[in-house]
């Protein structure tokens, strides 16, 4: 291979390794068999959630994973691989890809990484069942509001009972 090609591939490895280091979550899938229309819809959904989705050669992915400290992730880079990176929402790529795979059986989740730790296919699927960030925040808010609401209702009940007694 010419030195220019080797340099270009080394640069690509560096770019992918940086994306892997910066990502909150990484999901690796086998998208072989998706139609162009399905792939376009999937990419649009992922882009809407600020998830970057790329088809990258396995040799480059293996080298980038090594460089990013995710050596154990190399075992999923077998066969055609596409990678979804999310820097913000840990759940988004897993949720979108899992939901999409229910309608498009050709899409298969292979594994990934969560917050810099390698995750198996089962762990990625478990992550996909969690509510998204907004859902988790609303659950937290309702848990925090419950005691205040209970105190307010108790005070209101006491006030009403005193009014009835008077």
From Swiss-Prot:
Gene3D superfamilies: 3.30.70.1730. GO terms for biological process: translation. One of its GO terms (molecular function) is structural constituent of ribosome. It holds the Pfam family Ribosomal_L10. InterPro entries: Ribosomal_uL10, Ribosomal_uL10-like_sf, Ribosomal_uL10_bac, Ribosomal_uL10_bac_type, Ribosomal_uL10_CS_bac. One of its GO terms (cellular component) is large ribosomal subunit. Keywords: Ribonucleoprotein, Ribosomal protein, RNA-binding, rRNA-binding. It comes from the Bacteria. The keyword RNA-binding applies. Forms part of the ribosomal stalk, playing a central role in the interaction of the ribosome with GTP-bound translation factors. Belongs to the universal ribosomal protein uL10 family. Part of the ribosomal stalk of the 50S ribosomal subunit. The N-terminus interacts with L11 and the large rRNA to form the base of the stalk. The C-terminus forms an elongated spine to which L12 dimers bind in a sequential fashion forming a multimeric L10(L12)X complex. This is Large ribosomal subunit protein uL10. It comes from Streptococcus pneumoniae serotype 4 (strain ATCC BAA-334 / TIGR4). The gene is rplJ.
């Amino acid at each position: 291979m010419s030195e220019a090609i080797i340099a270009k591939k080394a640069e690509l490895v560096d770019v992918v390794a940086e994306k892997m280091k910066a990502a909150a979550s990484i999901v690796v899938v086998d998208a072989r068999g998706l139609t162009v229309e399905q792939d376009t819809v999937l990419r649009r959904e992922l882009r809407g959630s600020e998830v970057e989705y790329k088809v990258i050669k396995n040799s480059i992915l293996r080298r980038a994973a090594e460089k990013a400290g995710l050596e154990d992730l190399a075992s999923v880079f077998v066969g055609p691989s596409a990678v979804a990176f999310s820097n913000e929402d840990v759940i988004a790529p897993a949720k979108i890809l899992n939901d999409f795979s229910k309608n498009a059986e050709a899409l298969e989740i292979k594994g990934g990484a969560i917050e810099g730790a390698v995750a198996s296919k089962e762990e990625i699927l478990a992550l996909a069942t969690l509510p998204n960030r907004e859902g988790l925040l609303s659950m937290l808010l309702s848990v925090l509001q419950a005691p205040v609401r209970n105190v307010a209702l108790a005070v209101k009940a006491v006030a009403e009972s005193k009014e009835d007694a008077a």
